[in-house]
From Swiss-Prot:
Species assigned in the record: Gallus gallus (Chicken)
Family per similarity comment: Belongs to the ligand-gated ion channel (TC 1.A.9) family. Acetylcholine receptor (TC 1.A.9.1) subfamily. Alpha-5/CHRNA5 sub-subfamily.
Cysteines paired by S-S bonds: C156-C170, C220-C221
Reaction catalysed by this enzyme: Ca(2+)(in) = Ca(2+)(out); K(+)(in) = K(+)(out); Na(+)(in) = Na(+)(out)
Protein name: Neuronal acetylcholine receptor subunit alpha-5
Entry's localization field: Synaptic cell membrane; Cell membrane
Keywords for the protein's UniProt record, in alphabetical order: Cell membrane, Disulfide bond, Glycoprotein, Ion channel, Ion transport, Ligand-gated ion channel, Membrane, Receptor, Signal, Synapse, Transmembrane, Transmembrane helix, Transport
Gene Ontology biological-process entries: acetylcholine receptor signaling pathway; membrane depolarization; monoatomic ion transmembrane transport; neuromuscular synaptic transmission; response to nicotine; synaptic transmission, cholinergic
Higher taxonomy: Eukaryota, Metazoa, Chordata, Craniata, Vertebrata
Keyword Isomerase: no
Annotated control of activity: Activated by a myriad of ligands such as acetylcholine, cytisine, nicotine, choline and epibatidine.
Subunit structure: Neuronal AChR that forms heteropentamers composed of two different type of subunits: alpha and non-alpha (beta). CHRNA5/alpha-5 subunit is only able to form functional nAChRs when co-assembled with another alpha subunit, can be combined to CHRNA4/alpha-4 or CHRNA3/alpha-3 and CHRNB4/beta-4 or CHRNB2/beta-2 to give rise to functional receptors. Interacts with LYPD6.
Length: 454
């Protein structure tokens, strides 16, 4: 009986077995990497500075990349940032020949397993001086690249003079905590802070961020450090809409108090309401800015000035209302100089309608009424009655004219302080904004021109 040919199973031929021949290659690479780690870290001491000679200096290329400006706490004078510390140095004890280890040119090693420079942020405010324990990239020639992400809270002296149109200069100072310059030297990699992955902040904008290297001498040793200066500008739109404009509006609202008639009781109510509103705004600013007696923000000075302004308007309004309700029965006769100034001179200067002074109007001359012995008694009685009525009417006219004169003086006072307070409000507002415009022109414009030229 002829042997029946066995059916060949799918995938059982040489072509199907070919991929299995390459299965050993990844295993070989893995074994080579394992062998490389054993070779590098056998008897390795991560606390020993990796140099061939004791006097050799390890040069650290240092750079900074910022990913986010998280917050600027003006009250506590802190700047919170998310940064990446770019560090690179040569480790003479971590070198190998790639040909001996399946062509491996780089490996990833945890940072807490090898020697790393103890570069910290000197002006740290939360006690966290070290970076995050992330892996380092070790190349075959001994070059180590380590870029740990760090969340820093650094101290920043806040200058609130031009709040909310202020620019702050916050610095971050990095250096070795234990090594001097002869052991570990820091080389500034980039003059500019890397902002390619920067996430914009809704309140602050980074104008410039530059680095510089310096040295601090302490006795026989010198200590290198790198300082990064961040010039940040506050975006003032929010505070302009909800703080500056209402404050200016309240100051000009005070001017309208003098436009109300003097007999209106709402004048005092309006002044008091404005004063309370300004007090609330002042408390809001006090919650934002740091408690310092060195610098007072311009907006704070403007609010205090406006509060004094409103207080004076209340005093003047009370005085004007008192004058408005004066009469000959409650006060003495008006002094001649008061009449001359407030009834004749000031109305012309204030473009007011001339007030006709009738108080000293020449009285009609009394007619000579020669008594006739032959006049009747009834005629004399009638004349006496007419004289009495005339005197009574003239007296009432005089009293009414005195009251009208005092009312007109109150109107003159209101008009005079209306123009005076309006002028002072405009000048105060200009004094607030002119220094801000000058400050921005001296800083923002050169930076913008420089960035355009580059």
């Amino acid at each position: 009986m002829p042997l029946r040919a066995r059916s060949r199973k799918p995938g059982a031929g040489p072509a199907a077995r070919a991929p299995q021949a390459g299965v050993s290659e990844p295993s070989f690479v893995a074994k080579s990497e394992d062998r490389l780690f054993k070779h590098l870290f056998e008897d390795y001491q991560r606390w020993v500075r990796p140099v061939e000679h004791l006097n050799d200096t390890i040069k650290i290329k240092f750079g900074l990349a910022i990913s986010q400006l998280v917050d600027v706490d003006e009250k506590n004078q802190l700047m919170t940032t998310n940064v990446w510390l770019k560090q690179e140095w040569i480790h003479v004890k971590l070198r190998w020949n790639p040909e001996d280890y399946a062509g491996i040119t780089s490996i990833r090693v945890p940072s807490d397993s090898i020697w790393i420079p103890d570069i910290v942020l000197y002006d740290n405010a939360d006690g966290r001086f070290e970076g995050t324990s992330t892996k380092t990239v070790v190349k075959y020639d001994g070059t180590i690249a380590w870029t740990p992400p760090v969340n820093y809270k650094s101290s920043c002296t806040i200058d609130v003079t031009f709040f909310p149109f202020d620019l702050q200069n916050c610095s971050m100072k990095f250096g070795s905590w234990t090594y001097d310059g002869s052991q570990v030297d820091i080389i500034l990699e980039d003059y500019e802070v890397d902002k390619r992955d920067f996430f914009d902040n809704g309140e602050w904008e980074i104008v410039t961020a530059t680095g510089s290297k310096g040295n601090r001498t302490d006795g026989c040793c010198w200590y290198p450090f790198v300082t990064y200066s961040f010039i940040i500008r506050r975006l003032p739109l929010f505070y302009t809409l909800f703080l500056i404009i209402p404050c200016i509006g309240l100051s000009f609202l005070t001017v309208l108090v003098f436009y109300l008639p003097s007999n209106e009781a709402e004048k005092i109510s309006l002044c008091t309401s404005v004063l309370v509103s300004l007090t609330v705004f002042l408390l809001v600013i006090e919650e934002i800015i740091p408690s310092s007696s060195k610098v007072i923000p311009l907006i704070g000075e403007y609010l205090v000035f406006t509060m004094i302004f409103v207080t004076l308007s209340i005093v003047i309004t009370v005085f004007a209302i008192n004058i408005h309700h004066r009469s000959s029965s409650t006060h003495n006769a008006m002094a001649p100089w008061v009449r001359k100034i407030f009834l004749h001179k000031l109305p012309k200067l204030l473009c007011m309608r001339s007030h006709v002074d009738r108080y000293f109007a020449q009285k009609e001359e009394k007619g000579n009424m020669s008594g006739s012995e032959s006049s009747r008694n009834t005629l004399e009685a009638a004349l006496d009655s007419i004289r009495y009525i005339t005197r009574h009417v003239m007296k009432e006219n005089e009293v009414r004219e005195v009251v009208e004169d005092w009312k007109f003086i109150a109107q003159v006072l209101d008009r005079m302080f209306l123009w005076a307070f309006l002028l002072v409000s405009i000048i105060g507002s200009l004094v607030l904004f002119i220094p801000v415009i000058h400050k921005w022109a001296s800083i923002i414009v050169p930076v913008h021109i420089g960035s355009t030229n580059t």
